[in-house]
Amino acid sequence: MPIREIRHPLIRHKLGLMRRADISTKNFRELAQEVGALLTYEATKDLPLESYEIPGWCGPVQVEKIAGKKITVVPILRAGIGMLEGVLSLIPGAKVSAVGVARNEETLQAHTYLEKLVPEIDERLAMIIDPMLATGSSMVATIDLLKKAGCRDIRAMVLVAAPEGIAAVEQAHPDVTIYTASIDQKLNEHGYIIPGLGDAGDKIFGTKQKDS
């Protein structure tokens, strides 16, 4: 499984701002969208193109457009919603599927409680978005669901990834590429990424925050 850590200066700068303990909900939310957009740029660099002709100001002009499969963006609820607007700013024509996954705070295992997939999803490139790849259980559960629905071209974008989560996805789904802004050090005993961002969902939605 390719894991691609995107160390672009803009991403590094914005991620550094997101790590502040005293960051406001507004700023965290805006930065999550911005980094999500930058990751989308990298995750779509290899999409195929095809030429076609349009009427230009001086006559017919050959231009290019994205060819091949259509795209569905798959936010893992709820935190994945925090990256959605940034992703759609670059691919506004993409359809949105949604997968709700809850993690048991004691066992750290995930279970799926909601799936709203677009029609003919098996014919689309599925791009999963979730701010944190911690234990990997939510990501694995989502990929399991998408593959069961017929998806064969799946990519994932996360703001921060832990080595444990990367290993879990690699073991279960070695064909899925993960794009991340940072590979962090480890998980703590509560399954939170160190140094991480804290609870990304709480910070995006302004609910009670937990320690990272």
Curated annotation (Swiss-Prot):
Description of how activity is regulated: Allosterically activated by GTP.
Annotated transmembrane regions: none
Cofactor: Mg(2+)
Top-tier EC class: transferase
Pathway the protein takes part in: Pyrimidine metabolism; UMP biosynthesis via salvage pathway; UMP from uracil: step 1/1
Binding annotation for 5-phospho-alpha-D-ribose 1-diphosphate: R78, R103, D130, P131, M132, L133, A134, T135, G136, S137, S138, D199
Catalytic activity: UMP + diphosphate = 5-phospho-alpha-D-ribose 1-diphosphate + uracil
Domain of life: Bacteria
Keywords: Allosteric enzyme, Glycosyltransferase, GTP-binding, Magnesium, Nucleotide-binding, Transferase
Binding site for uracil: I193, G198, D199, A200
GO molecular function: GTP binding; magnesium ion binding; uracil phosphoribosyltransferase activity
Similarity comment text for this entry: Belongs to the UPRTase family.
Known function: Catalyzes the conversion of uracil and 5-phospho-alpha-D-ribose 1-diphosphate (PRPP) to UMP and diphosphate.
Protein name: Uracil phosphoribosyltransferase
